[in-house]
Amino acid sequence: MKRTVSALTVAFLALGGVTATSAAGHAEEAVLIPGATVFKEINPLYPLVALTYPVIGINFHDDPHPQLVEYSQNALDADRALREGVARAQRVVDKIDGPVVVIGESMGSVVASRLARKLADSAEPPSKDDIRFVLIAPPEAGVAKWFTVGTFIPLLNYRVSRVPESPYHTTIVIGEYDFWADPPDRPWNLISLANAVMGAAFVHGPPISATNPANVPKANTTTTTNSAGGTVVTHFVPTPQLPLTQVFRLIGVPDKIVDQADRILRPIVDAGYRRHDKPGDTRPYLANGGIHRNVQGQQQARDGAQASVSKKAADTPKRRKRLRDRVERSLREPTTRVAERRAERRKGPLSAESKSGASEQPQ
């Protein structure tokens, strides 16, 4: 199997010009778990899709002969495929003597994350130094969040779950606008939804699998520690050109025209994602099987309104007091002096100078 995968890797790199670089910093064996497909045995496109498997996470390991986990990959019988994938991946990992990196893409990332949890719960769990995981385009960190945990989707024979936490170092790679890993929070924004659906074709799969972490902006990389004590590094990979308009580029529409369309459409697309919301934005969004609003934003809006009302309420007595003081001072002063002040205000500086000049004339 290693020899076959290695040959495919060489062929793919020769055609695509992808360069493998080491992200591990030390020698380790790589185990690759591909994503879902349908009718694998009779699908005429499957052999072409399989040619891309060697590129899965190619910039996250330096193994020249990665092992490929073979399982059903059946998207229409997901739970069974996932169980089979975990069992087969574990057998591959158990045979490796030394450090290993398990890299899963799409459905393969679900297999990898469940394997990590299973190994951590085993009687003799591997050391943190001996194994790490890379999850590329994980749907359980994306579209699955539309639904509550435990929701059963009959069409896919899949029960919704989240990415399980483990003590092992885990890298997550998410491509912007990828429907499976980065769907809009407001799917009723049809332009945003259509863009994400196109992202399933133009971002998901080989494009995101070939991500080089060195090219991801530092601001788009976060590091956290989960409840199991594992370090989780997340790379959010920007998509410079909207997937929604990629078809026009492919059919030969000049980039200048499509770029202009992108500039018009991107704010509409981004309005479907909470990450672009401004403070105080209370627009609804879909999460965990229900419609929610930004409670913090609502509270900020309420606090701001209350502060404005309080300020006005506090200013009103002050204004009234200043007015009363002014009236009282006017009443205490001689009437003639008040008249003079009023005259000075009406006539302005010139009248004051004229008055001064008149007082200096000899009597």
What are these regions (language model features)?
Residues 2-9, 20-106, 110-363:
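Composition-driven, intrinsically disordered low-complexity tracts enriched in small residues
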Residues 13-19:
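Hydrophobic core
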